[in-house]
Amino acid sequence: MLQPSRRKYRKEQKGRNTGIATRGAKVSFGEFGLKAIGRGRLTARQIESARRAMTRHIKRGGRIWIRIFPDKPISKKPAEVRMGNGKGNPEYWVAEIQPGKVLYEMDGVDETLAREAFRLAAAKLPLETVFVHRQMG
């Protein structure tokens, strides 16, 4: 699963996920892409689960790019622990997603196969997504 190898600080404040994606909003590596039209956060497990679904569907052909990375730690207190006594330990990693962000890209396969692979991947994600083509020019 994806997670940063080194970080300056172990824990991060909650923050707010606002705005729309301006960077990473175009298909730039492959021919087809899966673009988020919803807002939310994807865990490292969800990103990996969607990647596996796509990889299994396209078998040997094609190439997949993951355009997102879970770089935000989410901390959680253990079960049945009283409030206070500091912040909990980092439990898992998430990528914050704004509408318009390209999540995955694919190349080397025909459109019908890519559409089906992205449909299977989208079923694993808690966001609304749309299939997109590369814009020429």
Curated annotation (Swiss-Prot):
Stretches that traverse the bilayer: none
UniProt keyword annotations, A-Z: Ribonucleoprotein, Ribosomal protein, RNA-binding, rRNA-binding, tRNA-binding
Coiled coil: none
A molecular function (GO) term: rRNA binding
GO biological process, one term: translation
Pfam families linked to this entry: Ribosomal_L16
Record's GO cellular component terms: cytosolic large ribosomal subunit
PANTHER family on file: 50S/60S RIBOSOMAL PROTEIN L16, LARGE RIBOSOMAL SUBUNIT PROTEIN UL16M
Family membership: Belongs to the universal ribosomal protein uL16 family.
Subunit details: Part of the 50S ribosomal subunit.
Function statement: Binds 23S rRNA and is also seen to make contacts with the A and possibly P site tRNAs.
Protein known as: Large ribosomal subunit protein uL16
Biological source species: Aromatoleum aromaticum (strain DSM 19018 / LMG 30748 / EbN1) (Azoarcus sp. (strain EbN1))
Protein's gene: rplP
